[in-house]
Curated annotation (Swiss-Prot):
Bilayer-spanning residue ranges: none
GO molecular function per UniProt: ribosome binding
Family: Belongs to the RimM family.
Domain notes: The PRC barrel domain binds ribosomal protein uS19.
Organism encoding this protein: Prochlorococcus marinus (strain MIT 9301)
Listed GO CC annotations: cytoplasm; ribosome
InterPro entries per UniProt: PRC_barrel-like_sf (IPR011033), PRC_RimM (IPR056792), RimM (IPR011961), RimM_N (IPR002676), RimM_N_sf (IPR036976), Transl_B-barrel_sf (IPR009000)
Protein name: Ribosome maturation factor RimM
Domain PRC barrel as annotated: residue spans: 100-176
Amino acid sequence: MINKNEWLTVGLITSCHGINGQVKVKSLSDFEERFLKPGMRWLQKENEPPSKIELISGFKQPGKETFIVKLQGINTRNDAEQLKTFKILVRTDKLPKLKKEEFHLLELINLEVKTLENDELKTIGKVINLENEKNNLLIIELFKNQKKVLIPFVKEIVPLVDIKNQFVIINPPNGLLEL
């Protein structure tokens, strides 16, 4: 379950765009309105506390998962360059409500990872983090050797997610856990 006082990173400011203080944001969210709809947002630099800032406008770059965003008080290219590597956050208690079988990716962290071997479920590790570039990847730490492996989060490899009972079942191709 999601802790109500936590933050979820939904975007990363990767660079400035133009000379009027716009920034380029790499989306880590399925909800585009987070970068399009004006309103208050939260920014975080490295491990500093998040701070409020108002999103004035935004648009999605055609054919990409990036957005060009204008933030209140960021009016020059130099201002925008200062925000490079900042995270755009939302509070986990403000996450959209989902349908019964849906879940937020953040809820996968700390779930046990199980495989089906000889008709028995065997716990092999836990999800310690997520990576989201073009595809979602689960970062799993294996119990047997504390090795970290990346597992593509696709139905063929992760056929079952059980948030209520705190585990996922994976069906990795041969050799994936040995990489």
